[in-house]
Regions:
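Helix-to-loop junction immediately C-terminal to a conserved catalytic motif
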Residues: 51
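ABC ATPase NBD coupling module
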Residues: 68-84, 181, 220-224
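Conserved ABC ATPase "signature" region
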Residues: 111-126
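Conserved ABC ATPase signature
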Residues: 130-134, 138
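Catalytic Walker B motif of ABC-type/P-loop ATPase nucleotide-binding domains
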Residues: 155-158
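H-loop/switch region of ABC-family ATPase nucleotide-binding domains
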Residues: 190-191
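A short, surface-exposed alpha-helical micro-motif characterized by mixed small hydrophobic
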Residues: 196-198
Length: 242
């Protein structure tokens, strides 16, 4: 069963200049699917369409069989509990502790449930600290814990390691590996190809508003398609030098 289905999706913010143009893709529930593409290619737009934060100008978006593009806001909120959307930044409230920030996902959540979510991201012992008292990696992991409080079936993640140093990136990567081992699928927008090769089951490349490539990470790195080579060549050169 598909978790996420795009059928002929078109989206423009300026008339006559579509960011996405007839894009179609079928994303499996259990897979960790990375969305790659050049800056401005529409990767994040795709993720926001999946979350129902944007509506397509044409085409259809389905999540768990529900027509995201036609749902009223109340139904969208229920759907987002099943597949929460994590923005690029941690989006924490500075005056709330990490535990309190995580609990904001569901005010009915028990303290035990919140602590379990924090434990899954390695922050059980830091729950009483404020965001200003922890580093960027812990803040990002708190945002992931906030999503886990909902007991989601799927995650929509926009650039989970952007702005993080190597140590913080490694911490987030460890959490994502743990979630994958637990069977939780995700759509991950990222330009971090090292993370992609370590974590992804599938890769979707967005170029010129369309689905330019879909395959495994190995197929992605080996592809000779110009749209793919433009992305992978710098990474492969750096990896060879390192």
């Amino acid at each position: 069963m598909s978790a996420l289905l795009f059928r002929g999706v078109t989206k423009a913010f300026v008339p006559g200049r579509p960011v996405l143009s007839g894009l179609s893709a079928d994303v499996s529930t259990r897979d960790v699917t990375f969305v790659a593409g050049a800056s401005g290619s529409g990767k994040s737009v795709l993720c926001r369409l999946a979350a129902g934060l944007l509506r397509p100008d044409a085409g259809e978006v389905e999540l768990f069989g529900e027509p995201v593009h036609r749902l009223p806001e109340r139904a969208l909120r229920r759907l987002r509990q099943r597949a929460p959307y994590l923005v690029q930044g941690p989006a924490l409230l500075d005056w709330r502790t990490l535990s309190e920030n995580a609990a904001l996902a569901d005010r009915r959540a028990s303290p035990e449930r919140v602590q379990e979510a924090l434990g899954r991201v390695g922050l059980r012992e830091l729950g009483d600290r404020l965001p200003s008292q922890v580093g960027p990696g812990a803040k990002k992991r708190t945002a992931i814990a906030r999503a886990l409080v909902l007991a989601p079936e799927y995650l929509l993640m926009d650039e989970p390691t952007t702005g993080l140093d190597r140590v913080a990136t490694a911490q987030v990567e460890e959490v994502l590996h743990g979630l994958k081992r637990s069977g939780l699928g995700a759509l991950v927008v990222s330009h971090d190809y090292r993370l992609l090769t370590a974590l992804a089951d599938r890769v979707l490349v967005v170029a010129e508003g369309r689905n330019a490539f879909s395959g495994t990470p190995a197929e992605f790195l080996a592809s000779s398609l110009p749209e793919v080579r433009a992305l992978t060549a710098p990474y492969l050169e750096t990896a060879a030098d390192g």
